[in-house]
Amino acid sequence: MTPPMCSNSFFNHSSSIDHDSLPTKIVAGSSVSSFFCFLLEDSSSSSSSASSDLRFLSLDSSFSLSLSEDEDEDESELEDSFDSSFLVSSFSSSSSSSEEESEEEEEESLDSSFLVSASLSLSEDDEEEDSESEDEDEDEDSDSDSDSDSDSDEDEDEDEDSEEEEETALAFSSLACLEALTSFLLPFTLVVLAILFYPAWVE
């Protein structure tokens, strides 16, 4: 603010006064006017300083308000970013936990399917082994039956052979008996016949 100029008619009653010659020409009216001008200038300077102080205070307060608003905005932005980062981290953690749960469920399902397939394969192997053992038992039974049949046939053949041998032995023994009997009876019969028919032959 520019200080007000001393333009009052009371102070400027003498237009012919040269202000440059105030120190040399001392006039009562001019000294009074200069004194009041000094007072007015002092009051105007004080008012201008006060207004400048007020302006500075207003600028300072507006600057502080703008700074506080900026700080509030920064804090709100930080809070928003923190909230967004927290939401992102929570979402990522939840998604990772859900992925881990899904992976665990898949592993459990794979393990259960593997166990089921392993049990089925073991049961199939057991059934195959049982069928093979049954076939082997049947083969052994058939072999034993065939062996028993062959043994019985061999026994029958041996019995027949032994019977034939016994029969041949009996025949040979009977022939031997006949030969012995004939060898004994033939001279005896000749002697008996000679005794019986000798007198007839003599006559």
From Swiss-Prot:
Residues annotated as transmembrane: 182-202
Domain of life of the organism encoding this protein: Eukaryota
Subcellular location field: Membrane
Entry keyword Flavoprotein: no
Positions with biased composition (Acidic residues): 68-82, 98-110, 123-168
Disordered as annotated region, ranges: 65-84, 92-170
Topology within the bilayer: Single-pass membrane protein
Keyword annotations: Membrane, Transmembrane, Transmembrane helix
UniProt name for this protein: Putative uncharacterized protein YGR160W
Species of provenance: Saccharomyces cerevisiae (strain ATCC 204508 / S288c) (Baker's yeast)
